[in-house]
Amino acid sequence: MWFPQIIAGMAAGGAASAMTPGKVLFTNALGLGCSRSRGLFLEMFGTAVLCLTVLMTAVEKRETNFMAALPIGISLFMAHMALTGYTGTGVNPARSLGAAVAARYFPHYHWIYWISPLLGAFLAWSVWQLLQILDYTTYVNAEKAAGQKKED
């Protein structure tokens, strides 16, 4: 799945570059005052929140959630709002690579945009597994049942 996504990221970067005049401005770069370690952790936590949202809304199949795209989109929007000024918001290695290829600009810290999403995905999966072990659905279902009893 990685290879097609990377090709698509480069194609999207090239298409966006072709459609916008002048220099490519959508590359990922650390903002002023943002160190590599800060950028690494910000990207990791932004990706973790996004991945945990996907796991809890789209992957968790205990009940159907036809509105899963809404919280996922809101999570991505919030990651962009929080991170763009600091890191340019990668949260996806293919997106970061596509923009870098289109701009022909690979900063010495480009590795952050590859390592952070992997660490963030692992962190989200770990939290999700912990919630599975703690059987969080027992509490969620008890709250839903209590809410239904109040309505009756």
UniProtKB/Swiss-Prot annotation:
<keyword id="KW-0472">Membrane</keyword>
<feature type="transmembrane region" description="Helical">
    <location>
        <begin position="66"/>
        <end position="86"/>
    </location>
</feature>
<dbReference type="Pfam" id="PF00230">
    <property type="entry name" value="MIP"/>
</dbReference>
<dbReference type="InterPro" id="IPR023271">
    <property type="entry name" value="Aquaporin-like"/>
</dbReference>
<feature type="short sequence motif" description="NPA">
    <location>
        <begin position="92"/>
        <end position="94"/>
    </location>
</feature>
<feature type="transmembrane region" description="Helical">
    <location>
        <begin position="39"/>
        <end position="59"/>
    </location>
</feature>
<feature type="transmembrane region" description="Helical">
    <location>
        <begin position="111"/>
        <end position="131"/>
    </location>
</feature>
<dbReference type="InterPro" id="IPR034294">
    <property type="entry name" value="Aquaporin_transptr"/>
</dbReference>
<dbReference type="InterPro" id="IPR000425">
    <property type="entry name" value="MIP"/>
</dbReference>
<feature type="topological domain" description="Cytoplasmic">
    <location>
        <begin position="132"/>
        <end position="152"/>
    </location>
</feature>
<keyword id="KW-0812">Transmembrane</keyword>
<comment type="similarity">
    <text>Belongs to the MIP/aquaporin (TC 1.A.8) family.</text>
</comment>
<dbReference type="GO" id="GO:0005886">
    <property type="term" value="C:plasma membrane"/>
</dbReference>
<dbReference type="GO" id="GO:0015250">
    <property type="term" value="F:water channel activity"/>
</dbReference>
<protein>
    <recommendedName>
        <fullName>Putative uncharacterized protein YLL053C</fullName>
    </recommendedName>
</protein>
<feature type="topological domain" description="Cytoplasmic">
    <location>
        <begin position="60"/>
        <end position="65"/>
    </location>
</feature>
<feature type="topological domain" description="Extracellular">
    <location>
        <begin position="87"/>
        <end position="110"/>
    </location>
</feature>
<feature type="topological domain" description="Cytoplasmic">
    <location>
        <begin position="1"/>
        <end position="5"/>
    </location>
</feature>
<keyword id="KW-1133">Transmembrane helix</keyword>
<feature type="transmembrane region" description="Helical">
    <location>
        <begin position="6"/>
        <end position="26"/>
    </location>
</feature>
<feature type="topological domain" description="Extracellular">
    <location>
        <begin position="27"/>
        <end position="38"/>
    </location>
</feature>
